[in-house]
Amino acid sequence: MKNKYQPFWFSEAIASETQLNIRQLENKIQSDICIVGGGYTGLWTALQLKKKQPSLNIVLIEKELCGSGASGRNGGCMIPLTTKFSTMKKIIGERDAMNMVTASESALFKIKDFCDEHNIDAQIRIDGGLYTATNKTHEGVLDNLIQNLKTSNINSLNRMPKAEIQKKAGSLKHIDGYFSPLSGSVQPGLLVRGMKKVAEKRA
């Protein structure tokens, strides 16, 4: 079902394009690989496959516009899986959980490098993020997580003084918390539409 409303991020990205370059599937075609869905996952899969094996004939099909689904209508928060480490450790084991955390953290910089390489202005900022408590019940909730991260030597969160947290957050509601430099933001619509253009060039 077609979305009745377009989110701001996606609308802004579409408005910045002089030509949408929509190619409709009208006849039967053949390909080595067919990818269904033109969001982050579909486009990145196509890009990586083409990079590893340029001779592949890859077709990507999308019902609406590339990026018009979840990829173009999320909050644009670039947050790694750091705070999920303890849970993942119980489910998949320490080594795999560590790999998941470090991979998700390095992904921030890989996305930025990709945008820099292809001149995609996706408004990426990797300025870090706050993980805070706003009431007494929340205080200390992350302590066990931090200890687990330290034990596995992958901790990137550092406790920040209350006054500094409040200043950085712009609110006195924050009474305790940690800061991690490995967090950021992106204009999701511009990112996914930029990925589409790169994929078209490599087709």
Model-identified regions with their sequence ranges:
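Extreme N-terminal leader/targeting segments of oxidoreductases
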Residues: 1-33, 51-57, 83
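Glycine-rich Rossmann-fold phosphate-binding loop(s) that bind the pyrophosphate
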Residues: 37-41, 63
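Gly/Ala-rich phosphate-binding loop of Rossmann-like dinucleotide-binding domains
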Residues: 46, 50, 198-200
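Glycine-rich FAD pyrophosphate-binding loop
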Residues: 50-73
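Dinucleotide-binding Rossmann-like beta1-alpha1 core, especially the glycine-rich loop
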Residues: 81-163
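Helical element adjacent to the flavin cofactor pocket in flavoenzyme catalytic cores
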Residues: 148, 173-203
